[in-house]
Amino acid sequence: MVTPYVEEHLNPASLDVTLGDRIMIELTGTRELEITGIHNYSEEQPYWIKPGEFFLAETREIFHLPDYVGAQFVLKSSRARDGWDHAEAGWCDPGWYGSRLTMELKNSRRLNALPIWPGMRIGQMKFLLV
C-alpha cells in the first residue's frame, strides 16, 4: 500500500510519513505558489520556514490504497509541539493509487523559523477499512 515501506516507520496504529524533496512556497504579492526543490538540504543543513509562512509539501511515500481502505493524515504530535500546523485536508479515499500526499503546512511560531529537510518525519497515516 505504501512505497517505499520502511519497517521502523510502522507504529501500533499508524505509519510515519516523511517529507519529499519538493515544496511550494507562497510568492510575495500574488496568489501563486512557487515550486522549490529541497533535495540539497538535510537535517544538518535544513531549509528554514519563516514564522507564519505557509507552504505545500508532498510525502516521499507513494500510496496505493485498495478499494476497501481509506487513510487519514495527521501531524505527528512532536511536530505540533515544535510549532507546525496542518490544514486538516488529509483524507485519502479508497482506491487512491500511485500518488503522493500533498500536505498544507504552516509554521505557527511567532518568532522562530522551523527547519525542514527531505526524509523528515512529519506526520502519520491512519488506515481504515471501509
Language-model features: where?
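DUTPase catalytic domain/fold
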Residues: 1-130
